[in-house]
């Protein structure tokens, strides 16, 4: 299978997964020669600055889009029009109109489109999903999802205009898949004095409440940390994970708390990034059914955009007040 990987930023994470497989032929597109050389030296992939040449080449099976967010929908549609399968990094689009266009084009095509909602394949998420579906601990009453990170990528910031879309979309997808769309949403935000920001969002449901929080105000040695706490009528599942300041060396654990006591629960499986790309390639080989369709992410994208707009209205009001 031949893959065109578009983008040298987050595309590096995808490149590492492809390189570990050894059964795909990857060509990386980028505009910065130094970054392309780094990817070529690290993974041995062919690189190019000729984007039109990629789209004109009928030998590519899959276009993997890791370009800036504003370009995602445009390139997904272009790839489909060229008869190629698509893997698109989050978010699918910056508005629901463009997202629906991709979903409609995907439904009308014999090519497959995958939105890289990798968290759906996280072993800890799958364990939680099964607990909710099977009512292992009764009814889910409170769901708390957290993600905290240092700014680990040179030149990249997570201010109020990007943090929800770039950092919390996956957490909000988890929320929607477990509890559905909320009745009400309340947000709060703070912006770092130089870089970063933090967001808290509270959601209400008829019989549950939820909180999603993200912070990009952490010092570099903090790395990335987060997880969930799910409180049921008859128990609690608590998941924590950490990764070092390179974003690597992840460690994750899930604990169960019930009236019988406390124990660590095994959440088996690959890391979510690897599992998601493995799923994409399995689908293209006819071995699995697409769980990452554009239609499947529309509700979570709508909620993400709603929170994004609420946070930025609040941030704008705070800035005006400060002046």
Predicted regions mapped to residue ranges:
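Mid-domain beta-loop-alpha active-site segment that forms a flexible
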Residues: 116-123, 151-184, 196-197, 296-297
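Contiguous beta-strand/loop segments that form the cofactor/metal-binding neighborhood of enzyme cores
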Residues: 172-245, 276-282, 322-323
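Short polybasic amphipathic segments
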Residues: 228-230, 245-260
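Active-site loop of classical SDR/Rossmann-like NAD(P)-dependent oxidoreductases
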Residues: 31-34, 264-278
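N-terminal Rossmann-like dinucleotide-binding module
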Residues: 1-43
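A contiguous active-site-proximal alpha/beta segment in oxidoreductase catalytic domains
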Residues: 93-152
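Beta-loop-alpha module in the N-terminal Rossmann-like domain of NAD(P)-dependent dehydrogenases
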Residues: 14, 43-103
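C-terminal helix-rich "cap/oligomerization" subdomain common to oxidoreductases
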Residues: 5, 62-65, 111-112, 278-323
